[in-house]
From Swiss-Prot:
PANTHER family: OLFACTORY RECEPTOR, OLFACTORY RECEPTOR 6X1. The gene is OR6X1. This is Olfactory receptor 6X1. It holds the Pfam family 7tm_4. Residues 1-23, 74-97, 159-195, 257-269 are extracellular. One of its GO terms (molecular function) is G protein-coupled receptor activity. Glycans are attached at N3. Gene3D superfamilies: Rhodopsin 7-helix transmembrane proteins. Belongs to the G-protein coupled receptor 1 family. SUPFAM superfamilies: Family A G protein-coupled receptor-like (SSF81321).
């Protein structure tokens, strides 16, 4: 599109260098998406169906699983479209809406993970006070606050983005409407908006990462004070899954977004985005359940109850 022409739509390039692999990639990503929905949905259903799992840790895990379902759903359907048609077009309002929900859910996810770290800290470092501090009311307030803060931060950024006139190149070298590539189509200088975006990113990502690190420093200190090696292993196993998810998510996102994105190369970012958008939400249910005896026991109970009832 010529410069000076007002843009009403964007063209998503997706992965143009993988000609001939569209069909197998479509099938692989579609199956991954279905497994992600099923895995995270099963976590939510299991927690709500099993009274023993209705404690703060699993309440926040349900929030995380719901966010993972929503996070992948904001991107994967359009990504699949790039494998089907040669020219994937998305209208301006749809593009901005996709960007809003994608970053809103992603921001909220960081905040929920931070609350989960705090819950792990209380469980291990202050086990006697944990039940009186992490009440159902406080859990609900913390989760709701995460959603509200995530919404507010991204909504303010989106409102600024909507005000921009777009008249440059409307081709986005990505598989979804990322903010960085979209800014390259703006008719005016976007340095201030980029700076505000970096500030918001620093507040959310490194800010929450610092809180997570402090929580785990206290947790590891408490674990090291346990006299027996068996106690070390048993206590650490209760937070190992959460630490794994935190490492995966923060590692990918810190690499992608802690730069002024409008002037960066997005080729490597696209690969990391695929891992962050597709694989991490798929792996989370397995990471949280593979060493969790309570969840595995609840799943086993859910699968065997119908058979028992039928035998009677």
């Amino acid at each position: 599109m010529r410069n000076g022409t007002v843009i009403t739509e964007f063209i998503l390039l997706g992965f143009p260098v993988i000609q001939g692999l569209q069909t197998p990639l479509f099938i692989a990503i579609f199956l991954t998406y279905i497994l992600t929905l099923a895995g995270n949905g099963l976590i939510i259903a299991t927690v709500w169906a099993e009274p023993r799992l209705q404690i703060p840790m699993y309440f926040f895990l349900c929030n995380l699983s719901f966010l993972e379902i929503w996070y992948t759903t904001t991107v994967i359907p359009k990504l699949l479209g790039t494998f089907v048609v040669a020219r994937t077009v998305i209208c301006m309002s749809c593009c901005l809406l996709q960007a809003f929900f994608h970053f809103f859910v992603g921001t909220t996810e960081f905040l929920i993970l931070t609350i989960m770290s705090f819950d792990r800290y209380l469980t291990i470092c202050n086990p006697l006070h944990h039940p009186t501090i992490m009440t159902s009311k406080l859990c609900l307030q913390l989760a709701l606050s995460s959603w509200v803060v995530g919404f507010t931060i991204v909504f303010c950024q989106t409102m600024l983005l909507i005000q921009l006139p777009f008249c440059g190149n409307n081709v986005i070298s990505h598989f979804y409407c990322d903010v960085g590539p979209s800014l390259k189509a703006a008719c005016i200088d976007t340095s201030i908006l980029e700076l505000l975006g970096v500030i918001a990113t620093i507040l959310v990502i490194p800010g929450s990462l610092l809180f997570n690190m402090i929580s785990y420093i206290y947790i590891l200190s408490a674990i090291l004070r346990i006299p027996s090696a068996t106690g070390h292993q048993k206590t650490f196993s209760t937070c190992a899954s959460h630490l794994t998810v935190v490492s995966l998510l923060y590692g990918a996102v810190l690499f992608m977004y802690l730069r002024p994105t409008a002037h960066s190369s997005f080729k490597i970012n696209k690969v990391v985005s695929v891992l962050n958008t597709i694989l991490t939400p798929l792996l989370n249910p397995f990471i949280y359940t593979i060493r969790n005896k309570e969840v595995k026991g609840a799943l086993r109970k859910a699968m065997t109850c119908p058979k028992t009832g039928h035998a009677k």
